[in-house]
């Protein structure tokens, strides 16, 4: 709260233009780490798959980012994530979504360490807890908008995520005044920065 109250001396992010991100080129060694991985790392049973928790959260709420981050395998009906905490040889990968290598693992795919949306979620939590004054609902909604708009710029697959699509999604995940609603959407927005989402889970217990 002290940093927020002294923004003249401790400025905070004010737009996606302030995001702390790594930009890469298509020539080694200046490439995204995942760009050096074969496509099989994203599509096989021994590769990396999204967990059912985040896939279910996004699917049930109509989150437009789901098609930016994940891909449905051929023949799949709907979105399905993998079960967490089991060995790959014990898992059934039938119909499980793949990570979208074109957006996450291209040689030139950017990697964001901290984004504007995270700052807004932090502000929303601080307001909800009574640490600072402000409009928690506005911070929450603007955080979601900032996250989606960031990923729209990253997307190379041509998904048509209009402002109307974003506003319809916001109507599906309204802020209800609780910390849980803030952290649940922050958890989704922190996809691909998993250590931050894990830190929030350890201190808040959300998402359940």
Language-model segments: residues:
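C-terminal functional modules
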Residues: 148, 152, 159-208
């Amino acid at each position: 709260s002290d940093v927020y109250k002294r923004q003249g001396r401790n400025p905070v992010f004010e737009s996606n233009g302030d995001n702390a991100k790594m930009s890469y080129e298509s020539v080694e060694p200046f490439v995204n780490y995942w760009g050096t991985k074969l496509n099989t790392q994203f599509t096989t049973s021994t590769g990396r798959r999204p967990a059912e928790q985040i896939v279910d959260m996004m699917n049930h709420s109509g989150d437009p980012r789901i098609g930016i981050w994940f891909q449905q395998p051929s023949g799949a009906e709907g979105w399905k994530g993998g079960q967490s905490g089991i060995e790959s040889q014990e898992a059934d990968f039938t119909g499980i979504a793949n990570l979208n290598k074109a957006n996450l693992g291209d040689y030139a795919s950017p990697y964001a360490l901290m984004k504007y949306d995270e700052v807004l979620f932090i502000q929303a939590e601080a307001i909800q807890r009574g640490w600072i004054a402000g409009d928690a609902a506005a911070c929450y909604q603007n955080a979601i908008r900032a996250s989606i708009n960031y990923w729209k710029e990253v997307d190379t697959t041509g998904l048509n995520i209009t402002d109307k699509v974003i506003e319809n999604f916001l109507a599906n995940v309204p802020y209800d005044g609780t910390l849980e609603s803030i952290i649940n959407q922050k958890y989704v927005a922190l996809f691909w920065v998993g250590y931050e989402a894990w830190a929030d889970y350890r201190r808040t217990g959300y998402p359940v």
